[in-house]
Amino acid sequence: MSVKIPRSVYADMFGPTTGDRVRLADTDLIIEVEKDFTIYGEEVKFGGGKVIRDGMGQSQVTNAQGAADTVITNALIVDHWGIVKADVALKDGYIAAIGKAGNPDIQPGVTIIIGPGTDIIAGEGKILTAGGFDSHIHFICPQQIEHALMSGVTSMLGGGTGPSHGTFATTCTPGPWHLGRMIQSFDAFPVNLGLAGKGNASQPAALKEMIEAGACALKLHEDWGTTPAAIDNCLTVADDYDVQVMIHSDTLNESGFVEDTIKAFKGRTIHAFHTEGAGGGHAPDIIKVAGLPNVLPSSTNPTRPFTKNTIDEHLDMLMVCHHLDPSIAEDLAFAESRIRKETIAAEDILHDLGALSMMSSDSQAMGRLGEVIIRTWQTADKMKKQRGSLPQDSARNDNFRVKRYIAKYTINPAIAHGVARLIGSIEQGKLADLVLWSPAFFGVKPDLIIKGGSIVAAPMGDPNASIPTPQPVHYQPMFAAYGRSLFASSVVFTSQAAVAEGLAKKLGIQKSLYGVENTRSGISKKSMIHNDATPNIEVDPETYEVRADGELLTCAPAEVLPMAQRYFMY
């Protein structure tokens, strides 16, 4: 016997279903459920008097016979490929299925089997996303990693050796010895980690040495001299080893202008960091490269989004990060040349057009690594408020805009850096790196962070309390962050050459190495999901005004942002 219930009652019980709409945090962004994989009247839910009990929603199937290790029930998945309601099965640390969970002995349409060996995470009324991937990390201190994890970031790629002056300014780990020590330290951290070697060299030998020693990418940084010769050499070596190259080009235009840098690319694929230019790069027109078919452009979050405070905070930030002296006129001029309100405003719009493909932090080196996700959605909200709905969206929802923006910190950096087969989206066969959110706290404070199928971090109340929720509630590492579980649930990104050389055994590390792949000619701007636009971008050298296909890109700075102070009162 079936009974009809109001949508509101159903949503309270099982979460939203097809056609229901959900607001993301306190933004103006509204998503609508496109499809519900569960079956009305056959939903599974855990708890006293609920469905997932022996002989009801729980079968007798063993894990060896195919029952899931964990099922996240009735979750609202938000990913680049869709916004859908489903049960999600995790098995052996990977995403095993997305569909309808239950007991196939008594329930129809079951594609995920719940057995006695299955644990349940209640996803009713929650949003499930892939773990974030921050591909612009200055590894200045190890404490960064926990802060990033608690924000919903489960993978980090960058460079450094700790609080050295080279690391303060540049995202690269120079030389085999430093690479080895850093990779050995990665056994302590429950996230996926990768290192970029220093790419600034005009001859290949030193770069090859670093790739074989475990670098999964090479970084060209102007503070080490990003000359056309270094660019060409670095890309040539990267092509030979199938690793990505990231570039921070020549702000001072000493060794050439943006046209010379583009010429040195020779059409080869490259990841352009902080493409707007406030983080560094040819002044004032590095932003032009965002329109090239071979450039994978990203932003760092200090300029995201453009607000009334953005310009003021940047100058001091830049002086500290790049070891500049405010008493030296040339240093001050260098800093001031990088901070331009016109290009920062254009950056907002280029993100909304899908011309800027990725978001990252620039951790402690002008960026805040715990705010990659927050600032992505603040940018999306600002653009909706200022530009209205995208042409691809209906009046009812912002689904396409949401898919465009979530791709910027999940699947697109994974594609750019050759790890999309492992991470970056909620798809069958990928590592179960997942984040569960309450809609009201979406993008700001996660409910649960899952790493390699295990709960790695969560907000937790007083451990001495009689229930888990009494204050004070703090984000804490969970069991997957300790012991050998840590090694089993995360990997180190390296080159395939390092894997073939047996680097893990040489360094005596416990984590598995994952060799990056398909980072060169196999990908281009067209590979950037929902963010593959290649407009012709022009910058006026006198006024710094930016035009895309002839249209002036300008917008007002935000006076107030969502996902901000009201979430951090305590």
From Swiss-Prot:
Keyword terms, alphabetized: Cytoplasm, Hydrolase, Metal-binding, Nickel
One GO CC annotation: cytoplasm
Domain of life: Bacteria
Coiled-coil regions, chain positions: none
Compartment annotation: Cytoplasm
NCBIfam families, alphabetized: PRK13206.1, PRK13207.1, urease_alph
UniProt protein name: Urease subunit alpha
Organism: Rhodopseudomonas palustris (strain BisB18)
